[in-house]
Amino acid sequence: MNYILETLNLSKKSGNTYRVKELSMQVPVGSVYGFLGPNGAGKSTTLKMILGLIHPDSGEIKVFNQKLNSSNKLSILGQTGSLIENPGGYGHLTGLENMQIIQKLKGVNEDEIERSLKTVRLFEQRDKKLKNYSLGMKQRLGIARALLGCPKLLILDEPTNGLDPAGIHEIRELISSLPKERGITVIISSHLLSEVEQMADYVGIINKGKMLYQGTLAELETKGEGLEDAFLKLTGGKESL
């Protein structure tokens, strides 16, 4: 199997406490990979290490079959889109103007703006000021910005946080469509099992910085377990279901 992302024994400490400990993950090309765990399990820390926002204490990261290092980080991350934490943006500017800022920073063709806005179904609202967008629309605009430059890999950290059911549905439909329509592999971190179950092909379950399970949803079913049962058994507690 071909993997677009692999980590090997990735670790990060905060003081004497491991935030991530010897974590190894493999994300297949063309998949939606659900990265699951309770709040504080180490999901965001792992994704920030993959994106070069913080440095691991030990272990290695391979993206596009290349070991991530200081000499190739910019070229590799240039093919990676991400939305970590809040989507941000300038409320007094339109959706289009917010996109143009990122387009110029990335140095990509302006045609990419239209394509990305159409992918997230915001093209018709491009001239509306960002402050008048719903939270779901702001999340979709954040994903549109991440899609500029045609990334091979898209990393989304809790993209449905704070959304109402309609907004969650919009994001779920969008994420599910990206591998087929754009050829993009998606990693989505979440603690909402029911949402990930409707989007993901593969899942990794993490708790206290350690990877506890990694594989397909189908493999869990062959063991007589659903995602919820496996999650509760592995993490030892009830989460958002």
Question: Residue ranges of each PLM-predicted region?
Answer:
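Conserved ABC transporter NBD signature motif
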Residues: 59-70, 75-76
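Conserved ABC ATPase "signature" region
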Residues: 100, 104, 110-126
